[in-house]
Amino acid sequence: MNKNKIIVFDTTLRDGEQSPGASMNTAEKVELAIQLEKLGVDVIEAGFAAASPGDFDAIERICGAVSKIRVCSLARAIEKDIKAAGESIKSAKFKRIHTFIATSPIHMEYKLKLSPDDVIKKAINSIKYAKTFCDDVEFSCEDAGRSEISFIKEIVEAAINAGATTINLPDTVGYRLPSEMSYMIGELVKFVGDRAVISSHCHDDLGMSVANTIACIKAGARQIECTINGLGERAGNTALEEVVMAIKTRSDVFAPLYTDINFKEIYHSSRLVATITGIEPQPNKAIVGKNAFAHESGIHQDGVLKHKETYEIMRAEDIGLEKNSIVLGKHSGSHAFRDKLVSLGYNLSEDELANVFEKFKILADAKKEIFDDDLRELMTDELVKIPCAFEIIALSSSECNKGHASAALTLKHNDEILKDSALGNGVVDAIFKTIDRISGIKGNLKDYQVRAVSQGKDAQAKVTVKVLFENSSTIIGHGLDTDTLMATAKAYIGALNSYISMKQ
């Protein structure tokens, strides 16, 4: 075991997806897993195999899509969960099962209704069963932050003897202070020694997840569990980008500790998560917020122009955020287009290149100046493919009196051309009602967001919708177009197609 390396365990695909409205389909999960491999994380928690057939399928597909990263499935300390986890990761080159049980008095008494001895027995049995599927087994003491240290040591001893290779101590409800997390981790590091890796998993309910994770590292934890953009249920999880950049930027404090993160993939990873989930980092978010490297104060601007380090402790280029220069136009050829995509980290087959180049030429005809962010959105739209049950052929709309509007749409469905129109309270409402009429499937819009992808009056609009259909969880749809209304229709159609694909 390398005592200087910090193992980065990313749980965006599992814990991050539990953030309200952040559900991802299988294609999106696979694309994100591929990006996390490029980012250089060591372990990805690809999902909770027993939760649903969709989760199981996504984990299986991720195992086939990555080759360098360790793929992990979460499982409760229940035999059927562990069996599902083991079967879902069996094709992975590197695999892990992560099993857990609550150890705090309040959880054992009210949730599990088990005695401490019974909890230990369940932990032992689950770890031994998990070891029949793979050698690498992680055990978590759920709600360790509110557990008694003496009991944590007792169950950890039993877990290691049963075969656990990593011991995770989560602050499940984000309750602990850095000094308290440091004490707990320090005690377990001394207790466990070299017998297992000690891991931290912090939540941000009191805004201290990153500070707590840093404290855990300083106390001896050698695995950190985190998510891109700090995505997660309630107030979120430890933000991966913040911790790894702290280790890099403050090497004077952390050396010789290090991670294997490819820092130049941080920004792209952040944008991909934001695009897929529709959850944008707040503008002043550390590292990846749009204002993270912006300076408005005249004094600050003057200082940065004279020497960047006067007010910048790291460079935007360090995280892969290059100057958003004009890169291509309608006269650009396929070779220049391919070279630019390669520089942005995309390697396409000839068929993929031909398909996306055709879309690029259409965009270039509508938009004079093409920026890096335009290409990133175009590629995300191309790589995260959803079967198209419905496709937009044409859209027209008109404003009526007193805020009312009408929309007319022509859609293609199974080689059949369908047309209809509807009135609504504004054009957006009219578009959605028309799609509902044509498809025969009614959706309930829960959220609607629109933003400009890049700069300029002809910037593409990126529309994200969150829709509830019959017997579905929230479905996310994205639309990209220089026409905001067309982007709106594409986003709703995208959500509809995802819903139909999930049902099938």
Swiss-Prot record:
Classification via CDD domains: DRE_TIM_IPMS (cd07940)
EC number: 2.3.3.13
GO cellular component: cytoplasm
Cofactor(s) the protein needs: Mn(2+)
GO biological process terms on file: L-leucine biosynthetic process
Amino-acid positions noted as binding Mn(2+) in the UniProt annotation, renumbered to this chain: 15, 201, 203, 237
Manganese keyword on record: yes
Reaction catalysed by this enzyme: 3-methyl-2-oxobutanoate + acetyl-CoA + H2O = (2S)-2-isopropylmalate + CoA + H(+)
Family annotation (SMART domains): LeuA_dimer
SUPFAM superfamilies, per the entry: 2-isopropylmalate synthase LeuA, allosteric (dimerisation) domain (SSF110921), Aldolase (SSF51569)
Subcellular localization(s) per the UniProt record: Cytoplasm
HAMAP family hit by this protein: LeuA_type1 (MF_01025)
Role description: Catalyzes the condensation of the acetyl group of acetyl-CoA with 3-methyl-2-oxobutanoate (2-ketoisovalerate) to form 3-carboxy-3-hydroxy-4-methylpentanoate (2-isopropylmalate).
PANTHER family the UniProt entry points to: 2-ISOPROPYLMALATE SYNTHASE 1, CHLOROPLASTIC-RELATED, HOMOCITRATE SYNTHASE-RELATED
UniProt protein name: 2-isopropylmalate synthase
Species of the source: Campylobacter hominis (strain ATCC BAA-381 / DSM 21671 / CCUG 45161 / LMG 19568 / NCTC 13146 / CH001A)
